[in-house]
Amino acid sequence: DYERTKTLSDQRARAAIAAGVPLVVVYPGVIYGPGELTEGNILVRHLLDLAHGRLPALVGKAERRWNYVFVDDVAAGIAAALERGAPGRRYLLGGENVTQGELYRLVGEVGGIRVPRLRMPDFLASASGSAMKGWARLTGGVPRLTPDLVEIYRHDWAYDSSTAAAELDYRPRSLRSGLETTVAWLREIGAWPA
């Protein structure tokens, strides 16, 4: 549903631009950082699962490249797009493109936690996701893994934010810096293990 609604909203925005509406569109990467611990804060929830040993194995191949962007950088990018963005332009507001292997190594270093080395094959992850989704329906909880999420893990999600950098002076922080801030916040609210 997430991808479908994103696609539909993008199509509507493009149609509005074509009709002369002065819109500026932004596309953030995978957003993380301090904020509500909701279903939408997927990376932070994932980090907490890692920190508390709730993930015996990692999903997705280590070489998959994703783009992670700190929440404050997205907010600054949106503000810059509102102030300086050219009507009709679309901007990718990303952070660093890193492999999943690099992400987990960095999470282990920054968070002082042991990260599993075992990788779950896609077919097993999909089956586990189906079971978790069914259990969540029965209990009213939020599944930690779903078949849709497993499908997302099967792809690269790397982006180039050079247009935003050139036109909006967009300068996101490093992944290490963002993770350090995020882990410090999680410690402060008592969610990260001591």
Feature-to-residue mapping (PLM):
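A conserved pocket-lining segment of Rossmann-fold NAD(P)-dependent short-chain dehydrogenase/reductase
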Residues: 46-69
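Short-chain dehydrogenase/reductase
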Residues: 1-10, 40-44, 64-68
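Mid/C-terminal beta-alpha module of Rossmann-like enzyme folds, strongest
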Residues: 77-144, 161, 174-194
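Conserved sequence/active-site signature of Rossmann-fold short-chain dehydrogenase/reductase
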Residues: 31-33, 74, 98
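Short aromatic/basic micro-patch
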Residues: 25, 65-68, 97, 158
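Conserved active-site helix of classical SDR/Rossmann-fold NAD(P)-dependent CH-OH oxidoreductases
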Residues: 7-14, 76
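Conserved beta-loop-beta element that borders a ligand/cofactor-binding pocket
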Residues: 11-34
